[in-house]
Every structure is written in C-alpha cells, then in structure tokens.
Amino acid sequence: MLFNNFLCFAVSAIPLVSAMPLGNAPYHHHHHAGLNASNITVGVNVTNTTAFSKRDGGFPDGVYDCSSFPDDQNGVVRLDYLGFGGWSGVQKNDGKYGTASTCQDNTYCSYACKPGMSKTQWPSEQPDNGVSVGGLYCKNGKLYLTQKDNSNLCEDGKGTAYVKNTLSSNVAICRTDYPGTENMNIPTNIDGGSKQPLSDVDEDSYYNWGGKKTSAQYYVNKSGRSAEDVCVWGNEGDDYGNWAPMNFGSGYTDGKTWLSMSFNPLSSAKLDYNIRIKSDGGSLSGDCYYEDGSFHGSTADSSGCTVSVTGGNAYFELY
C-alpha cells in the first residue's frame, strides 16, 4: 500500500523510495536528546493575530544584526513564546549541531513562516550524520543567507492544500521545523468554522534529504488548545507537541497533491474529532477518513492513509 512506504520513511528516516517521503522525522535520535525601502504588505501573526508590516524586497546579506529578528520580511513570523528571541530554533555550527539559546556567531538561526509558506534558507552542504540544519547564518554579529539565489526568506507552496475546520473550537497543528532542529513548533491555528492553507511544498524543487524528496509534516492536536501551549516539546504521557495524537503530511509532486494522515506512534492519545480527506474540484485517488478513533476508506490501513489528488485542491476536513 502506498501509505506503508510513506509512514516507514516518516518514522525511521530511512531513505526509502516513496510517493511522498517526509525527510528525517522528529523521531530521530537527536530529537529525543532535545527533550531535556521595498514594497510593504500587511501580514498577521498566527500566534497572536496582531498586524505587522512586511517587506517584499528580499533579505539583504550582512545588514541585520544577529540579535535582531527579521520579522519585517514577507511571510516571517516571530515565535517569542519559544524563548529564542523570535527564532524557531538555533543550532550550533560545531559538528554536533546542538541547540544554542540565542542567535549568535557561528550558529544557524531558523525561523517560522506563515501558514502555506515555507522557509527557503538552509546550507546546501548538510551534515552526513543524518542531522538537518536550516536557517540564516550568524557571522561576525550579522545575518547571512544560506541560499544565496533566493533572498525571500519565505515562499509559497503550490497552493493546493488546506485544512477546513467545521468544529466550534479551534485546532492547532504544528509543522516540523525541517531542515533545522526538527522540533514541531511552526504553528498553524485553524479557528472553528474557518480554514488555513497547508505548506504543500513542491517536492521536485524543495529541500531533499539523501537525494530523496521531502514534504511538510504536521503534528495534530486536540481541539481548543492554543498553538503556544501545544506547538512545543512535551513529556511522555502528554497529548500535545511530539506526543500529539496524529500526524499530517502534505506535498506536491508528479503533478499531484498528496495528503496523508497517520497515528503518531509515540502517542496513545486520541483526537476528540473526526477527519476526512476531501477535494475541491479535483479527483481523489481513493477514500480516506478517520472516525471514532479508527481509519477507514479504500486507501486506509490500521495506522493511517495516503491520498493523491489530481486537479483542484485537497484538504483535511475536521468534523
């Protein structure tokens, strides 16, 4: 079944050939150790819904201080609640790539983008030990691009995937910061009765791991929880963050949008709502839904399911 390869790659980070691989997953060993004058547009911070200005002219190399978070760049979102000065994570460039407390010299400083967008910055030469590294580079007190051919820090996906929340309360989903710390701390909050885009990255041109395509992965939480409370590392027995009940996957390749949902193998928690993969104007490869604690449909097995959509949009409906 299509889903089985997808899940195996997501969990073990083994570079299997898959229709929609996830890249190195948050179950990686180093993650468990982590437990202990340009055009202006207006954006909205998904964590506190305050308006702020955004610059569309691209990020200038060596201008911003490392102590200054570039939240005037189009699509970039501050995550102050994580305690890294707005950054989603900071990695030391010392061969081990452990976490630093602040963006400082010789570190990679990663950042969140608003829903539907993905960061564009990571060093082309990645560690050979399976760790991924991402973000801007801090050198001599200034921030520098790690992908010089793209000065826009965030980019849109294909725009063909989203989440529709028909519940009365909000649901927060947390994207893995990848390549980077791989923490599940990139927030998307979907208010009841609304929808939000997913980052359906173009897998043919986005970051690849070991020569394999990668897609976006999300941790899906119970309803009524704020992103600040659940898009963080939890502890064994919790039902949020890396212990959230469910995972979503989204991506675009071979002219198709791919959506996947699966139980989080680390967690025994269950969601308090149901989910169905649907299409708006497209053709689904099969049926897939989660209801009353189990997966159902022509593409489902006991762990989850994967569906491709040709034409139109694909979405997760929460009900």
UniProtKB/Swiss-Prot annotation:
Signal peptide: 1-19
Keyword presence, Ion transport: no
Leading EC class: hydrolase
A Gene Ontology BP annotation from the UniProt entry: polysaccharide catabolic process
Residue positions the entry lists as glycosylated: N36, N39, N45, N48, N221
Keyword Protein biosynthesis among record annotations: no
Location, primary (coarse class): secreted
The entry's keywords: Carbohydrate metabolism, Cell wall biogenesis/degradation, Glycoprotein, Glycosidase, Hydrolase, Polysaccharide degradation, Secreted, Signal
Subcellular location: Secreted
InterPro entries: Beta-Glucosidase_SUN (IPR051526), SUN (IPR005556)
A GO CC annotation given for this chain: extracellular region
Listed Pfam families: SUN
Gene Ontology MF terms: beta-glucosidase activity
E.C. numbers: 3.2.1.-
Family, per entry: Belongs to the SUN family.
Function text: Cell surface beta-glucosidase involved in cell wall biogenesis.
Protein name: Probable secreted beta-glucosidase C2G2.17c
